[in-house]
Design a protein with these regions (language model features):
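N-terminal alpha-helical segment
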Residues: 23, 35-38, 57, 150, ...
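A glycine-rich phosphate-binding loop feature that marks nucleotide/adenosyl-phosphate handling sites
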Residues: 5, 21-24, 60, 106-116, ...
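Active-site-adjacent "gating/activation" loops or surface patches in catalytic cores
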Residues: 9-23, 49-56, 63
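Short, well-structured alpha-helical segments
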Residues: 12-15, 104-112, 215-223
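Charged substrate- and nucleic-acid-binding regions of tRNA-handling and nucleotidyl-transfer enzymes
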Residues: 90-92, 165-258
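Active-site flanking loop/helix segments enriched in acidic
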Residues: 15-41, 67-76
Length: 258
């Protein structure tokens, strides 16, 4: 990009961090193109959404860096952990370009998580649940709706990235990827509350059962149970769990007083 200041043209580097991707070789077992060509094709595969497009521009910036690039036993390039380094770079770039904190957080998260789907094609729902629960408690998204939206965007990033590799020639594999994407979004939307406000009951219902001072701890207990996958986020199930929890506490308390 050029800018004119005091009668002089000045070159302004927009994304110097991406220059090393041009012509950067990738493992031909998985990739048809060099890293920059792969990036451009992934962008071309994606919906016209700013967060998705930025995530794809930045998702492989860590590839080829001296501390990341390795050779596997076949002598082909490998970039383990590039997504974490790419996320660090993405956060710095988007902050430099003046994007707001929530947008920077979202895109950085998309970049950091974009490699998580591939192993899930083999391991299935158990690993999905563990991953989603971890993100519900640690990702920084404030509500179940926010987390669901983030995962919906991540699925688009994953599919666009996947479609810029040899996988694009394997319709069954692409179909499995799309199915996995639908499964994870549905899991987040229906089974993974992020905060107590996402629960099917709140303080008003609990006031009929416990003192106001206990409500916060009871809601936290229910949130953990639902996130762990052993309690459905349904009003009757939650109320039953509260009754059982209070009964156990009363039994323990009476035993301590004997």
């Amino acid at each position: 990009c050029h800018a004119r200041e005091n009668g002089n043209d000045t070159v302004i580097p927009i994304l110097p961090e991406a220059l090393h991707l041009l012509g950067l070789h990738q493992n031909p077992r998985f990739h048809l193109y060099d890293t920059w060509e792969h990036t451009l094709l992934a962008i071309d595969n994606s919906p016209h959404d700013l967060a998705i497009r930025w995530a794809l521009v930045l998702h492989d910036l860590g590839k080829g860096l001296p501390e990341i690039r390795k050779l596997n036993k076949e002598g082909q390039p490998s970039d383990p952990g590039h997504e974490a380094e790419s996320a660090i770079m993405a956060q710095a770039i988007l902050t430099r370009l003046g994007y707001n904190n929530s947008f920077v957080h979202l895109v950085t998260w998309l970049v950091a998580q974009h490699m998580r789907f591939a192993p899930m094609l083999l391991t299935g729902e158990r690993t999905l649940l563990r991953w989603v629960r971890s993100e519900a408690t640690n990702s920084g998204f404030r509500t179940q709706a926010e987390l669901t939206q983030a995962y919906s965007l991540l699925v688009e990033v994953f599919l666009a990235d996947m479609g810029a590799t040899h996988a694009r020639e394997n319709e069954q594999l692409m179909a499995e990827g799309r199915l996995l994407g639908r499964q994870v979004v549905e899991l987040v939307r229906t089974r993974m509350p992020v905060c107590s406000k996402d629960l099917a009951i709140g303080g008003r219902e609990l006031l009929e059962l416990v003192h106001q001072s206990e409500i916060k701890s009871i809601l936290f207990y229910l949130l953990e149970r639902v996130q762990s996958g052993n309690l459905p986020n349904e009003k009757e199930a939650l109320l039953t769990a509260v009754h059982k929890h209070l009964k156990r506490k009363a039994t323990i308390s009476s035993g301590d007083n004997v």
